[in-house]
């Protein structure tokens, strides 16, 4: 076949434009289109990312696809709705399989690329049509989002390695978690965060700490707020550095717990909830530091984005956050941010930043920007994915 023209079908799990997976797929598709890939994208809604991908020239379709996972079972309402939801999701997916098959039957699709690991529709359709399929494994699932694969994790792991299936893992640790380290059909390809040459430098910082991400348990905002509370108590003085929280609330009960903690400790005036923002890059450029407190971040798109924007990163030394710190040390011989393992260590970092001149961290910020430019540019990611497509298609055609 002519590899200069690849017809690819993409299965996406969300139309949310704020998440790292959504940002990554948008820049990836733009880059692949420039290389001759013709994308057809299926999304579960007609808003947000559906509209953005249509604007860049992708062919977009709607199908009410749902993740192939077990519903939540916490709280009386979720318990009552557990079986109805499970049946409803499976009915929607059965309908979506037929709908997507109808979309592509005359399109001569060369490869199917599912943008997350928690959906099996792409695998099923690829098997039906004899098309190679890629799982883009972006999540631990259990460790980061408390997601349980249906019918079980072992069934998914068998699917990842079955004939005609390939995988892209966004970190080495996620690849290890899913037991794909010795699988020839699996690759580690880091997300492309920003274009080469897009590093921003801003030495005129403003007086605030930043959290940017969804407000839900796995993202670790409550432990951050507890550590921040200790900072205010220990060395904040009468005018502590405020904490800005930029992000969508996706777990109202969790957010309520955070607000109750804030009120109980009398720090309402020091923490500002900004809601979802479209100017996160600017917030990063002006912050004294961004804190990445996720319990087990997959890749840590926000962390890398902050480094591109000249922002000091304070990160929980686990998962993808740890891997990025380790990559920085391996590449530069220096730390590219401030790691912590406990809330107490996070508090100490906040106190240190608050009590230091900005120039103390300028070398760390500059080193981090150099590392992410070399490892996590859009161009590097696009080239790696495109070359993997070619390898897969050559393998399937031999």
What are these regions (language model features)?
Residues 173, 192:
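Carbohydrate-associated surface elements
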Residues 255-275:
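Nucleotide-activated donor-binding/catalytic signature segment of Leloir-type glycosyltransferases, i.e.
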Residues 276, 295:
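Aromatic "clamp/platform" in nucleotide-sugar-dependent glycosyltransferases that forms part
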Residues 360-375, 387:
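A short, well-ordered alpha-helix in the C-terminal region of glycosyltransferases
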